[in-house]
């Protein structure tokens, strides 16, 4: 199989930065490489193998006619979810998850039909509509609300074959609904998450914009490859290069997990992160988005 993503790309996107050590789920211990300045560092060798596994699942699911629902409503994920899902023609939810979106899909589908009916109305043609300006205004507002909440799944005619989740803690309702319907969950697992909730986990940073964007792009690439296989095309692959790595980052790159307990040189240490509640920056990388 061609290289899906390199460890260098994961490092440069900050995928390895976990939460502060006091904010973790012990079930994530097996995915943790070491700790630096009170922050857990995720083992990217394991992330890489789990990415390959998730990639193959998504690719095969789509190749056999399946649909992947992209879900990420936190600020750091909204743009990536929107762009990547639209790039590969998949449904998405990036604003607000409505309870019952999966478990009560028959009702949701009726609202989608209502949205399509409203889209047929010419709100600027008052004369031929047979409605008053006030009535048209009310219908326009109804349409805008439906577009905002359901626009991303406008063309989804049945529940998806699988869901891609950014931040399993924030999207716990979506995960709960998917599990009730036995819909496979593919998701980023940060160090504070529960791996038992996810079928195809990707250990990584679910708060940094670059990390979320990279991993969501990888999932979208898997969808694209699956679509090409479905249509009989020949998929390609991408590779990346980067800057020199710090010593402790090279340990990750080389898979030296036995070095987890060793001290890094001052220049090699990751900068300490503050609690997200105390700072507007993301917990993991300078210049990233805010916590949703």
UniProtKB/Swiss-Prot annotation:
GO MF, any single term: structural constituent of ribosome
GO term, biological process aspect, one: translation
Keywords: Ribonucleoprotein, Ribosomal protein
Annotated Basic and acidic residues bias: 247-259, 271-292
InterPro entries from the UniProt entry: Ribosomal_uS2 (IPR001865), Ribosomal_uS2_bac/mit/plastid (IPR005706), Ribosomal_uS2_CS (IPR018130), Ribosomal_uS2_flav_dom_sf (IPR023591)
Highest taxon of the lineage: Bacteria
Record's keyword annotation contains Ribonucleoprotein: yes
Region (Disordered) location: 230-292
GO cellular component term, pick one: cytosolic small ribosomal subunit
Any single Pfam family the record assigns to this protein: Ribosomal_S2
PANTHER family: 30S RIBOSOMAL PROTEIN S2 PROKARYOTIC AND ORGANELLAR (PTHR12534), SMALL RIBOSOMAL SUBUNIT PROTEIN US2M (PTHR12534:SF0)
NCBIfam families: rpsB_bact
Family as reported in the entry's similarity comment: Belongs to the universal ribosomal protein uS2 family.
Protein name: Small ribosomal subunit protein uS2
Source species of the chain: Thermobifida fusca (strain YX)
């Amino acid at each position: 199989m061609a290289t899906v993503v390199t460890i260098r790309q994961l490092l440069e996107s900050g995928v390895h930065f976990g939460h502060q050590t006091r904010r973790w789920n012990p079930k994530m211990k097996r995915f943790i490489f070491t700790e630096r300045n009170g922050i857990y560092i995720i083992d990217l060798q394991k992330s890489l193998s789990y990415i390959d596994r998730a990639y193959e699942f998504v690719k095969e699911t789509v190749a056999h006619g399946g649909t992947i629902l992209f879900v990420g409503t936190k600020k750091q994920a909204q743009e990536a979810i929107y762009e990547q899902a639209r790039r590969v023609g998949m449904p998405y939810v990036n604003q607000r998850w409505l309870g019952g979106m999966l478990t009560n899909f028959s009702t949701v589908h009726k609202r989608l039909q209502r949205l399509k009916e409203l889209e047929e109305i010419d709100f600027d043609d008052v004369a031929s509509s047979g409605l008053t300006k006030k009535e048209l205004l009310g219908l326009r507002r109804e349409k805008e609300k439906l577009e905002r909440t359901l626009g991303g799944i406008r063309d989804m005619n049945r529940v998806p074959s699988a869901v891609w989740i950014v931040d399993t803690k924030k999207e716990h309702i979506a995960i709960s609904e998917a599990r009730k319907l036995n819909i496979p969950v593919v998701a980023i697992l940060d160090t504070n998450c529960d791996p038992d909730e996810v079928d195809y986990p990707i250990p990584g940073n679910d708060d940094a914009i670059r990390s979320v964007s990279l991993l969501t792009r990888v999932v979208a690439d898997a969808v694209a490859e699956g679509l090409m296989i479905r249509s009989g095309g020949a998929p390609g692959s991408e590779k990346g290069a980067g800057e020199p790595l710090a010593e402790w980052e090279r340990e990750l790159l080389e898979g030296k997990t036995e070095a987890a307990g060793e001290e890094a040189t001052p220049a090699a240490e990751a900068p300490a992160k503050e609690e997200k509640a105390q700072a507007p920056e993301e917990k993991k990388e300078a210049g990233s988005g805010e916590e949703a």
